[in-house]
Amino acid sequence: MSSYYSVDAILTDAQKVPCTFELTVPGLGFLEGNMSGDMKQGSKVELPLWLGEMLALSQSLNTSSLVTLDPPSALSPRVLNALKADPRTVDLRALAPHFYDLGARILELFEEEKMIEVLSDTFKARAAVIADQAHNPRGALGEGADFMRGLDENERQLFRAAHDSAKAARTWMTDLKRK
């Protein structure tokens, strides 16, 4: 669970997720673009994760939840299959800037063993490439800039940490040679 004050957590919770209303709810038609109407049972709308989660967890008098959450398109079966095939070729940032954080939040709500495995394998495979790019002195230029565009925020932090540590190690080695 991330910090309440974390900007990354706020941005992750603002990610839209598909929701299906299980009940007719008076006055919520504006979520669908109907300013004066009700939200009809069976209506599908994309809501921020925080709101969808609250509505899914809240229950009416007959103990039915107001909405059913569906996994977001960033974690659809098509994307998970692409990640299984070759995780290095998928532009995670285009899917969700906070892809892994979104995956972690969705896994808090859904029990998806396969998704856990795919996300874990994806991170491991991409981390090796990130480390390789970070240790290249020209990693942030040219080809490296294209590489950086596809990284989600966690991967960018990993890249910066690896790049800065490699740079610090080179500086340290240079200083040792001078002495």
Swiss-Prot record:
The keyword Nucleus applies. It holds the Pfam family Sld5. One of its GO terms (cellular component) is CMG complex. Keywords: DNA replication, Nucleus. It is found in: Nucleus. GO terms for biological process: double-strand break repair via break-induced replication; mitotic DNA replication initiation. Gene3D superfamilies: 1.20.58.2050. The keyword Nucleus applies. PANTHER family: DNA REPLICATION COMPLEX GINS PROTEIN PSF3. Belongs to the GINS3/PSF3 family. Component of the GINS complex which is a heterotetramer of SLD5, PSF1, PSF2 and PSF3. The GINS complex plays an essential role in the initiation of DNA replication. This is DNA replication complex GINS protein PSF3. The lineage of its organism: Eukaryota, Fungi, Dikarya, Ascomycota, Pezizomycotina. The gene is PSF3.
